[in-house]
């Protein structure tokens, strides 16, 4: 608890320092500061921290005794014969070990890639240092337990998915394709990235929200069926996974609040980003720590970090009180959980 509280305090102190200047330059400096702090928090963790960091460490060490021929053979073995998975991550480890065989340095590389994308996200969709603080605390509360201490392959894939979205928005389609290919060979769940440009391009937000609501009902009624189907497809035994009620209520309420505040947003890019995030709303019944479908939603719910402070900023009454309450909640949840 003390370790997590320390980093929360550092982020708050950074906000107090950079908020004095109230300029876009100070906002950007605070974003850089935050990315460095959160990156160090992730990279400096012990290999025993996190659900599977130690397993990743063992695999990293095993790659040292894997030949290049075996690495390249893993691609046809995986995609032609179904033997193996995510050969791109194996290739990444092997290339990295040309320069360093230290797993700690590898964790630094992962942190740099992810928090570079994180900083780009904040630079594009925040307006002031208070919004950046809210994003940082929201990350510490909602996403630290995955991106910062476990799930290295998907952490990379989600970082690439953010850059993939920006490339699509900026009409850099070749870069889009390359990012998708790299993300897919690192983690096969990245195939769901193909939904991102489709959802982003839909202009009728209200109609899409109704469709999400209908899907929500279908998934809620048939939850066990869909979750077990995903477990079987992922080569896991079909089991009953409990519904994470508090997390589901949070996303349900937050989705409605964001829509209520942003539906008259002048910035079309924000409304399109809401389309991407709001797939989380439909997916809520399928969430659960042991559900493979939880991994799918990570490509979409990350955008709640920038949409929530944006929605609060558009609230005409009790704006500061709302920021205070949500940040207090995030601090409590960040320190008390994981």
Residue ranges: model-predicted function:
Residues 109-126:
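Transmembrane-helix motifs of polytopic, lipid-linked glycan transferases
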Residues 28-35, 42-70:
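Extracytoplasmic loop-helix module adjacent to an early transmembrane segment
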Residues 54, 58-62, 69-101:
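Short hydrophobic/aromatic helix or loop-helix immediately within or flanking a transmembrane segment
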């Amino acid at each position: 608890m003390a370790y997590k509280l320390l980093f929360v305090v550092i982020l708050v102190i950074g906000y107090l320092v950079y908020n004095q200047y109230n300029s876009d330059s100070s906002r950007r400096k605070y974003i850089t500061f935050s990315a460095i702090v959160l990156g160090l928090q992730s990279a400096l963790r012990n290999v025993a921290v996190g659900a599977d960091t130690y397993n990743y460490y063992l695999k990293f060490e095993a790659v040292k005794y894997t030949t290049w021929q075996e690495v390249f053979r893993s691609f046809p073995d995986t995609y032609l014969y179904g033997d193996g998975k995510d050969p791109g991550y194996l290739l990444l480890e092997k290339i990295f070990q040309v320069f360093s065989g230290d797993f700690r340095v590898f964790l630094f590389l992962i942190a740099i890639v992810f928090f570079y994308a994180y900083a780009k996200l904040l630079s594009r969709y925040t307006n002031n240092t208070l919004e950046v603080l809210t994003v940082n605390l929201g990350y510490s509360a909602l996403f630290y337990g995955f991106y910062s201490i476990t799930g290295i392959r998907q952490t990379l894939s989600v970082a690439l998915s953010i850059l993939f979205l920006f490339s699509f928005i900026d009409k850099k389609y070749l870069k889009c394709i390359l990012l998708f290919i790299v993300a897919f060979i690192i983690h096969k769940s990245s195939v769901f990235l193909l939904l991102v440009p489709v959802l982003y391009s839909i202009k009728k937000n209200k109609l899409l929200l109704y469709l999400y609501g209908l899907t929500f009902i279908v998934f809620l009624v048939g939850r066990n069926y869909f979750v077990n189907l995903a477990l079987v497809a992922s080569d896991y035994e079909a089991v009953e996974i409990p519904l994470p009620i508090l997390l589901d209520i949070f996303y349900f309420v937050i989705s409605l609040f964001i829509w209520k505040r942003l539906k008259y947003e002048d910035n079309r890019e924000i409304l399109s980003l809401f389309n991407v995030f709001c797939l989380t709303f439909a997916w809520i019944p399928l969430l659960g720590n042991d559900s493979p479908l939880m991994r799918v939603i990570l490509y979409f719910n990350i955008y709640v970090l920038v949409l929530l402070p944006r929605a609060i900023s558009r609230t005409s009454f009790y704006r500061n009180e709302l920021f205070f309450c949500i940040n207090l909640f995030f601090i409590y949840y960040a320190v008390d959980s994981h």
